[in-house]
Structures are given as C-alpha cells and as structure tokens.
Amino acid sequence: MLKVLIPTIMLFPTIWLSSSKWLWTTTTMNSFLIAFISLTWLKWTSDTGWNASNSYMAADPLSTPLLVLTCWLLPLMILASQNHINSEPVNRQRMYITLLASLQTFMIMAFGATKIIMFYIMFEATLIPTLIIITRWGNQAERLNAGTYFLFYTLAGSLPLLVALLLLQQSTGTLSMLVLQYSDPLLLNSWGHKIWWAGCLIAFLVKMPLYGMHLWLPKAHVEAPVAGSMILAAVLLKLGGYGMMRMMVMLDPLSKQLAYPFIILALWGVIMTGLVCLRQTDLKSLIAYSSVGHMGLVAGGILIQTPWGFTGAIILMIAHGLTSSALFCLANTSYERTHSRTMILARGLQMVLPLATVWWFIANLANLALPPLPNLMGELMIITALFNWSPWTIIITGMGTLITANYSLYMFLTSQRGSIPEHITNLSPSHTREHLLMTLHLIPIILLMLKPELMWGWCN
C-alpha cells in the first residue's frame, strides 16, 4: 500500500518545485510511474484475501481493482487537462494538478481503509478538491450553482452515516471491517434499527447516485472541467458502490426486508434516465445521465446481495469507470474545437476528424455493452442475479439495455454523422496527446476482456 501512497504524496513537492517548462512532463511521468507500480496489486499472493500493510490500511480483491483504477486515472486527467489549463498562470496550473493529486491520495486512503470511520473521513475529504475544481475551473457561471448542489446533496446524505457509525461503534465496540464481517449478526428489529439501516446506506445511494437522489450529478458533470468530469464519473461515483458493498455485509438480516423500495427506484431509474438521455441536446449532460442509469444497475446488483450481483456490480463499476471517462474526454476534445456542447451545433465531425470518430465509435459500443467487453459481462451478471431474485425484473432490465443501445447510437450519429454546420470554419486536427489518452482508456477495457478475474472481487 505504501509503495503507491508515498510516491503519490511525493507528487506534491514535485509539482511545486519543478520549473514551469517541465511541470506537465514531470507530473505526467511520475503519475504514470505510480500507475504502473499500482498494477502489482493485481498479482495476488495473500492466502487470507487481505493484503495488509498495517492495521489501518489493507487491500482485498474488492478494493484492489478500484485502487488500480484510481491510480490509472491521474495521468490521464493530467493529459486531458493540458490544453485548457496551459494558458493560465503557472501557480494556478500547479494548484490544479495539486488538487488532482490530493484527490488520488484521498481515494487511495478511502479504498484502502480497514476502519469504517477512516473510510468515512476520506469519503468526505474527496468533496473539497472536487468542489474547488468544479467552482474554480468550470466553464459557465452556473458552476457555483452546480457546486452548491454537489456539496449539499453529499453532506445531507453523509451526516446520518456519521451518526449511524457512532451508534455501531457503541453497540459492537469496533469499526474495523475485518472484525465486523466475522462478528455475530446484529439483532435489529425495532423502528430505530430500521432508521439506522437507512442512515448507513443513504450517503452511498446519494453518491452513486440512485435515481431520485441524482439531481446534483448532471449539474456537476456539465459544469466541471474535463478532469473533474473524469474523476467524478470514473472513481467518485464508485465510492458509493464500494461503501454499500462494505456496509451490506453488516446489515444483513434487515436488508432482506428494507431493500425493496431502493431496488425498485434503481431499476425504475435505469429506464427513466435512458429516456431522459434520448431527449438530451447537451453532450455532457447525456453522458452524465447515462452514468445514473448504469449505476442504477450496480445498486440493484448490490442490494439483492447475491455473489453474482456483487461480482456483476464490481465488473460494471470498473468497466463503466473507464468508458464514461473516455466519453467525457471525447466530449472535451470536441468542445475545445467547436466551443459548444450542443450536439446539433457540433455535428458532422467525422468529415474533419476521422480518427476521433473511431474512438467515439469504440467508446459508444463499450457504453452500450457490446459483447465481449466487460461492460456486457457486468450487466449480464446483474441482470441474471435480478432475474433469479424476481423473473419480472427482466422486463425492466431488458427495456433498459434496449434504451441504452438507442441513446448510445443517437449520441454517436448526432455528433459524428451528417454535414458540418456552416459556422464551423477552422478546426485544428487531433493531437497525438488525445489519441494517446483514448488508447490508454480503451486498452485496459480490452485487456480486462481477456482476463476478467482481475476484477471479480471475492468470487474469484
């Protein structure tokens, strides 16, 4: 754990001490080095399942894929941000990269925490850099409104969790995940216990977000700069799913009765957000709503608590993290050239940027879960688990996948095909940096297709 955490912390002096000429080069190279070191976590040597560096930090098959995803994304975010941050004063550039590195530090400590209270603190700490990135480097004036939504939704959801954790500490005497998963089931039968159960999960359902608690997400995504959108879609939403998986083990007897309304909301959200996507004109908003739909499937898979549901959820979280991040990068490359997120005003780009169209096509196919990509594997496992739980869910999930395919193709055709609008007269060609960025997003998806057991979690 420390072999990644210490180099990440050492990024801070690197950022502030390197000369302005070499700032982006050194930080990109160092973060790539950290990303490659983190791949060693995937080689599992421990017999117990837990690979602990001390009593506070440990990795297990559930957190390892998410830790590696976090480390993999930092260099990609730095690469994606170079163009639009380069024109700012050097100290602001340093501040921006510092915020991205601090986000990675908090995420590693959140996914690697063995004490739930430490996970909670790091879960909340990620809020501050994300909020600064959205409200300081966002594109439009609405970014302050988006930041307010983001802050208050997350805080309002998280306060009950803190109270619930203090009550858990009082009743069991420990908040260690290692101890709690082997302790006797808690006898939960009163109304107070049911409220406590909801308090444990609401924070994670807001973060995922569950349909109905999702209004902060499209606003935050649309207003955030490219790196903010990437980290939000790829890793911050996954904190919610990861936290739910960790907490569900302890809430077992009650979840069987109380999870129904949340499963219904999650599945209903898959269809509703898909239909919303079909009516979107804003490219980033469409990708943001598609994230809500995919995370609805993940929430459904986790809430029914079967091994297939859990495995499908973690596979879909990793695959969706890479895919949605790639889509936001592509949306940014088109925005940097046309200065518009409205799809009708930025259409027909296949004529000008043919290779970028290939990346759009692959990313959209991954988004609609084309076989044999891991997105399909995750969705199939969740759909199968839900079908075993109740055969009627196949109607909802089947319609959901159909609508997903529809809006993915709608996004591709609207942004790439057709004639170029008359107001677009001068477009710069694609940079090698952008092609490298897309390659590094899509290569892991293809490699995971060949060896999916790297992200199967505990079911391996």
Swiss-Prot record:
<comment type="subunit">
    <text>Core subunit of respiratory chain NADH dehydrogenase (Complex I) which is composed of 45 different subunits.</text>
</comment>
<feature type="transmembrane region" description="Helical">
    <location>
        <begin position="351"/>
        <end position="371"/>
    </location>
</feature>
<feature type="transmembrane region" description="Helical">
    <location>
        <begin position="114"/>
        <end position="134"/>
    </location>
</feature>
<dbReference type="Pfam" id="PF01059">
    <property type="entry name" value="Oxidored_q5_N"/>
</dbReference>
<dbReference type="GO" id="GO:0045271">
    <property type="term" value="C:respiratory chain complex I"/>
</dbReference>
<dbReference type="InterPro" id="IPR010227">
    <property type="entry name" value="NADH_Q_OxRdtase_chainM/4"/>
</dbReference>
<feature type="transmembrane region" description="Helical">
    <location>
        <begin position="436"/>
        <end position="456"/>
    </location>
</feature>
<dbReference type="GO" id="GO:0032981">
    <property type="term" value="P:mitochondrial respiratory chain complex I assembly"/>
</dbReference>
<keyword id="KW-0496">Mitochondrion</keyword>
<dbReference type="GO" id="GO:0009060">
    <property type="term" value="P:aerobic respiration"/>
</dbReference>
<dbReference type="InterPro" id="IPR001750">
    <property type="entry name" value="ND/Mrp_TM"/>
</dbReference>
<protein>
    <recommendedName>
        <fullName>NADH-ubiquinone oxidoreductase chain 4</fullName>
        <ecNumber>7.1.1.2</ecNumber>
    </recommendedName>
</protein>
<feature type="transmembrane region" description="Helical">
    <location>
        <begin position="225"/>
        <end position="245"/>
    </location>
</feature>
<feature type="transmembrane region" description="Helical">
    <location>
        <begin position="195"/>
        <end position="215"/>
    </location>
</feature>
<feature type="transmembrane region" description="Helical">
    <location>
        <begin position="285"/>
        <end position="304"/>
    </location>
</feature>
<dbReference type="GO" id="GO:0048039">
    <property type="term" value="F:ubiquinone binding"/>
</dbReference>
<dbReference type="InterPro" id="IPR000260">
    <property type="entry name" value="NADH4_N"/>
</dbReference>
<keyword id="KW-0813">Transport</keyword>
<keyword id="KW-0249">Electron transport</keyword>
<dbReference type="Pfam" id="PF00361">
    <property type="entry name" value="Proton_antipo_M"/>
</dbReference>
<keyword id="KW-1278">Translocase</keyword>
<dbReference type="GO" id="GO:0008137">
    <property type="term" value="F:NADH dehydrogenase (ubiquinone) activity"/>
</dbReference>
<feature type="transmembrane region" description="Helical">
    <location>
        <begin position="308"/>
        <end position="330"/>
    </location>
</feature>
<feature type="transmembrane region" description="Helical">
    <location>
        <begin position="258"/>
        <end position="278"/>
    </location>
</feature>
<dbReference type="InterPro" id="IPR003918">
    <property type="entry name" value="NADH_UbQ_OxRdtase"/>
</dbReference>
<keyword id="KW-1133">Transmembrane helix</keyword>
<keyword id="KW-0679">Respiratory chain</keyword>
<feature type="transmembrane region" description="Helical">
    <location>
        <begin position="148"/>
        <end position="168"/>
    </location>
</feature>
<dbReference type="GO" id="GO:0015990">
    <property type="term" value="P:electron transport coupled proton transport"/>
</dbReference>
<comment type="function">
    <text>Core subunit of the mitochondrial membrane respiratory chain NADH dehydrogenase (Complex I) which catalyzes electron transfer from NADH through the respiratory chain, using ubiquinone as an electron acceptor. Essential for the catalytic activity and assembly of complex I.</text>
</comment>
<keyword id="KW-0999">Mitochondrion inner membrane</keyword>
<feature type="transmembrane region" description="Helical">
    <location>
        <begin position="94"/>
        <end position="113"/>
    </location>
</feature>
<dbReference type="GO" id="GO:0005743">
    <property type="term" value="C:mitochondrial inner membrane"/>
</dbReference>
<keyword id="KW-0812">Transmembrane</keyword>
<comment type="similarity">
    <text>Belongs to the complex I subunit 4 family.</text>
</comment>
<keyword id="KW-0472">Membrane</keyword>
<keyword id="KW-0830">Ubiquinone</keyword>
<keyword id="KW-0520">NAD</keyword>
<feature type="transmembrane region" description="Helical">
    <location>
        <begin position="20"/>
        <end position="42"/>
    </location>
</feature>
<dbReference type="GO" id="GO:0006120">
    <property type="term" value="P:mitochondrial electron transport, NADH to ubiquinone"/>
</dbReference>
<feature type="transmembrane region" description="Helical">
    <location>
        <begin position="61"/>
        <end position="81"/>
    </location>
</feature>
<feature type="transmembrane region" description="Helical">
    <location>
        <begin position="380"/>
        <end position="400"/>
    </location>
</feature>
